[in-house]
């Protein structure tokens, strides 16, 4: 771990995974003091992700302390392709990236992180994907003295965090009638939601992934969701996160049998459904699974005092039933002044890739599904 001091603050660069593992308690305390935390920056999620996907020697986690107390952190890693880049830990299986700043010392912490990042990125471009518009990383971008660029990234759909029945009650006309009918169908069948305790998480993850595979039978499933490393990551991370309240697992049972399972993640103002699995027999019974799941996650968000219910990445048409607001994540590129040509090159690479994707999707509509599946693969530095 390398370190330097500036303005009474100690800035360190953690490159050792064991040292990162030892940060759990103070990292989680900082996560709770942050104004804009997402579940994907929890220590449980990042530590587990690195075990499954990280590469030795690539860890680059910036830490800021005042009098020994952690007040800022940026969980990054080094990749070499297509060029040297500092990118977020968490890869493509994480929907959002942010830095962590102690809310009471955010100004000092972000300034120190900026200075630390300037040193850590002496020969690299910083490429921060999936940054929410209100993220703390926006403060870092705003104060960055070197070259920078803001690009658009994934679109997410969001709703206010309130019980779904309340939202449906305000809907008028045929749309409201259809949604109320779908909810009554679930209730009439007697499907019951059961929260899974921490010690039940390993078995519940196995059930969720089996149901997820079954629901995609005959269609193009994200292959990463069927791999052992992904299952192992969820078992490790979600077990801890259920314990500290940043995750919830819910099984839906019909006559005692699990017919659907859902994993939701939450922290700060945000709750979102991350992954689910459902028995195809529910479709045969005309059950609207997305409506059933959304009602449960919305209730969790409301009960937990959250203000935002995120439908996470993707603007699929079925999400529009509820009248969500689209929120576009951003991609922030940063570099030292002398590395501006490299930043512009990276900017061009991203633009060319996006144009190619749009061209293929326009000329070959069937490729849209393939692109969405492949875009979800955990390719580091994507």
Regions found by a protein language model. Name each.
Residues 2-9, 13, 138-166, 170, ...:
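Active-site/acyl-donor-binding loops of N-acyltransferases
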Residues 4-6, 89-93, 185-188:
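Short, flexible turn/loop "capping" segments at secondary-structure junctions
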Residues 9, 95-97, 191:
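Short amphipathic alpha-helical segments
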Residues 11-86, 131-154, 162, 169-285:
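A conserved beta-strand-loop-helix scaffold within acyl/acetyltransferase catalytic domains
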Residues 65, 94, 102, 107-118, ...:
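Aromatic (often tryptophan-rich) hydrophobic motifs at membrane interfaces
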Residues 75-98, 342:
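Conserved acyl-donor/pantetheine-binding loop and adjacent beta-alpha core of acyl/acetyltransferases
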Residues 98-103, 194:
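Acyl-group handling in specialized metabolite and lipid biosynthesis
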Residues 118-135:
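ATP-hydrolysis module of ASCE/P-loop NTPase motor domains
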């Amino acid at each position: 771990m390398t370190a330097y001091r500036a303005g009474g603050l100690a800035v360190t660069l953690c490159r050792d995974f064991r040292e990162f593992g030892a940060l759990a308690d103070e990292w989680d305390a900082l996560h709770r003091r942050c104004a804009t935390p997402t579940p994907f920056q929890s220590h449980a999620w990042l530590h587990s992700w690195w075990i499954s996907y990280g590469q030795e020697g690539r860890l680059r986690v910036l830490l800021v302390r005042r009098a020994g107390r952690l007040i800022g952190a940026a969980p990054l890693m080094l990749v070499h392709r297509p060029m040297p880049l500092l990118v977020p830990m968490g890869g493509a299986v994480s929907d959002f990236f942010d830095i962590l700043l102690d809310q009471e010392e955010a100004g000092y912490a972000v300034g120190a992180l900026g200075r630390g990042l300037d040193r850590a990125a002496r020969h690299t471009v910083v490429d921060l994907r999936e940054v929410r518009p209100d993220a703390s990383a926006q403060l870092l971008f705003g104060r960055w003295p070197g070259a920078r660029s803001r690009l658009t990234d994934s679109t997410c759909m969001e709703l206010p965090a309130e019980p779904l029945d309340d939202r449906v009650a305000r809907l008028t006309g045929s749309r409201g009638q259809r949604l109320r009918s779908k909810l009554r169908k679930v209730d009439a069948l007697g499907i019951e939601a059961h929260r899974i305790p921490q010690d039940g998480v390993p078995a519940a993850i196995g059930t969720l992934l089996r149901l997820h595979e079954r629901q995609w039978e005959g269609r193009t499933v994200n292959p990463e969701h069927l791999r052992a490393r992904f299952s192992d990551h969820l078992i490790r991370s979600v077990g801890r996160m259920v314990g500290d309240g940043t995750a919830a697992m819910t099984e839906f049972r019909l006559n005692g049998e699990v017919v659907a399972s859902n994993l939701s993640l939450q922290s700060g103002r945000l709750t979102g459904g991350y992954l689910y699995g459902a028995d195809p027999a529910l479709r045969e019974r005309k059950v609207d699974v997305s409506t059933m799941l959304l009602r449960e996650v919305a209730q969790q968000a409301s009960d937990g005092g959250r203000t935002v219910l995120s439908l996470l990445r993707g603007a699929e048409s079925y999400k529009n039933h509820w009248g969500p607001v689209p929120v576009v994540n951003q991609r922030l590129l940063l570099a030292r002044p002398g590395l501006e040509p490299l930043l512009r090159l990276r900017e061009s690479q991203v633009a060319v890739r996006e144009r190619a994707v749009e061209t293929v999707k326009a000329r070959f509509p069937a490729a849209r599904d393939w692109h969405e599946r492949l875009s979800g693969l955990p390719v580091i530095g994507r």
